Amino acid sequence: MTASSVHSPVRQNRTGLGMRRIRHIHFVGIGGAGMCGIAEVLANQGYIVSGSDLRESAVTRHLRDCDIRVYIGHVDEHAHGADVLVVSTAVDLENPEIRWAREHRIPVVRRAEMLAELMRFRHGIAVAGTHGKTTTTSLTSTLLAEGGLDPTFVIGGKLTSAGTNARLGEGDYLVAEADESDASFLHLQPMVSIVTNIDADHMATYAGDFARLKDTFLEFLHNLPFYGLAVLCLDDDNVRGLLPRVQRQFVTYGFAEDADYRLRDFVQRGGEVQFTAERPPGMAPLEIRLGMPGRHNALNALAAIAVASDAGVDDAAIQQGLLHFAGVGRRFQVHGHYPAPGGEGDVMLVDDYGHHPREVEMVIDAVRAGWPERRLVMLYQPHRYSRTRDLYEDFVRVLSGVDTLLLLDVYSAGESSIPGAEGRTLAGSIRQRGQVDPIFVESKQELPALLSRVLRPDDILITQGAGDIGGISLRLAAGQLDLNGMEL
């Protein structure tokens, strides 16, 4: 998959006769990770696509490059002429564009409904799970492409090799993330479903009931046709617990000895892992090298191997696809190095999107395994007050595992502040635990001076979180930010 394939030419419409009345599709919240990819694929299928978002971003600029009209701000005129509106769950239903559509009998659908329509006439592969969806979707898409199957993909992060998070392929396969955050993945009816893990997150959707969350994942699996296939991670206790209730054909994967696709002889050296992928009888084991750190990424790769093997991808193509996999934006993305303040040597700059305690813990474990002799400095921005409240003690425990912690206030993502779930309170609880003395960052303007004070030669600096801190390590690597506090 190469950067030259980013802007796919307009192709034959494959959404079938059902959408023959639809010419103009308008996205409300088009800059969102789950929205922009669907918009790009539809534009490449020949639809007129427009959209609106609250603010300008690299995503909105990219969409304009794809001949999609993007408006900044929300007013009803933006939706005029549309035959259907696609909305994300982050958008208020009192949005003026949505109100206009309802007043004029224009259908308003959720993003998952439109994704389901794209999937309807293809061999759909849906990747679900609390953690690892984006990486697993990217790996699966890469292996199918390496095998010559030319898949369409819709991913929640930028696939580095393609330079985009979506692409319209010529083949029959469509690979996409299945979002459990609002239970909208139940709209999807794929041929293959992956479940990487099930963890407590987005619990408001499930009325705080973890059993209900697990039941919803089971319902998602039962959306498979009777001839479909589920690919399930046996290392996750919650996924394993579902197996007796799954009424579709499935294969399992994991480090577990009873997994159908078993990962053994795992070794990590720096940012690369090597392992043997044992497969079901009749398929030879594969020796794998992957340029991503961590046991969790090896598991993500094993899920992709299971799907690619089922699709008949050649063994050599699987090995080459993983060997040359260039990663995903903001998933342990190494931006480069920065000269260490006041000394020889430099600081390794890493950016990661993880914002759940388990995700942060996996990043920390990957650093400890790959660079055990180096100090880990984490700049963490909590994401959502509700998540911070619900997983508070887990955050305290996990964030206590770094060497130096700089803690920003919570990125609200539109939520109101919740007493006791603020960044300053979290910093106090971590300090009280006694393993690390966190520095609470009042304002991002303080960061250059603070980083200059705490960083040492050979440190690893990780900017961690799903909010708006992702550009800091990139700006440092590009020489656009001076740790003496001056913009270059």
UniProtKB/Swiss-Prot annotation:
UniProt-recorded Gene Ontology molecular function terms: ATP binding; UDP-N-acetylmuramate-L-alanine ligase activity
GO BP field: cell division; cell wall organization; peptidoglycan biosynthetic process; regulation of cell shape
GO CC entries: cytoplasm
Keywords attached to this entry: ATP-binding, Cell cycle, Cell division, Cell shape, Cell wall biogenesis/degradation, Cytoplasm, Ligase, Nucleotide-binding, Peptidoglycan synthesis
Annotated compartments: Cytoplasm
Function, as annotated: Cell wall formation.
Protein name: UDP-N-acetylmuramate--L-alanine ligase
